Amino acid sequence: MSEVNVPLSFSDAAASRVKALIAEEENPALKLRVYITGGGCSGFQYGFTFDENVNDGDTTIENSGVTLVVDPMSLQYLIGGIVDYTEGLEGARFFVNNPNATTTCGCGASFSV
């Protein structure tokens, strides 16, 4: 596990929502893990899950007492990005504002570099 100053941000809105979800689950050990997988209409897609573990090589980013976890493979695609949360007409969701993405799909769930 490394806790370094990486150019990846974890917004206050995302941290607040994670904190609320962790409280609902009544498990303070949970952390939000963001990861990249192959797929989606643009080649890569973002995934979000709750995880109790921090693996060797993972990077952690903290905000408001909650932790975002990123594996080293995914981190290379997320450098300079912002993990955020929004609620709107399209529903509520976590998303990544990713400056590395050269194209994104209409919903923002997948991208290419």
From Swiss-Prot:
Cellular component terms per the entry's GO annotation: cytosol
Origin: domain of life: Bacteria
Details of cofactor binding: Binds 1 iron-sulfur cluster per subunit.
Xref: Gene3D superfamilies: HesB-like domain
Cofactor(s) essential for the protein: iron-sulfur cluster
Gene Ontology MF terms in the entry: 2 iron, 2 sulfur cluster binding; 4 iron, 4 sulfur cluster binding; iron ion binding
InterPro entries (alphabetical): FeS_biogenesis, FeS_cluster_insertion, FeS_cluster_insertion_CS, FeS_cluster_insertion_RrpA, HesB-like_dom_sf
GO BP field: iron-sulfur cluster assembly
Disulfide bonds: none
Residues engaged in binding iron-sulfur cluster: 41, 105, 107
Alphabetically ordered keywords of this record: Iron, Iron-sulfur, Metal-binding
Pfam families assigned to the protein according to its UniProt record, in alphabetical order: Fe-S_biosyn
Alphabetized PANTHER family for the sequence: IRON-SULFUR CLUSTER ASSEMBLY 2 HOMOLOG, MITOCHONDRIAL
UniProt subunit comment: Homodimer.
Family: Belongs to the HesB/IscA family.
Primary role: Required for insertion of 4Fe-4S clusters for at least IspG.
Protein name per the record: Iron-sulfur cluster insertion protein ErpA
Organism for this UniProt entry: Vibrio parahaemolyticus serotype O3:K6 (strain RIMD 2210633)
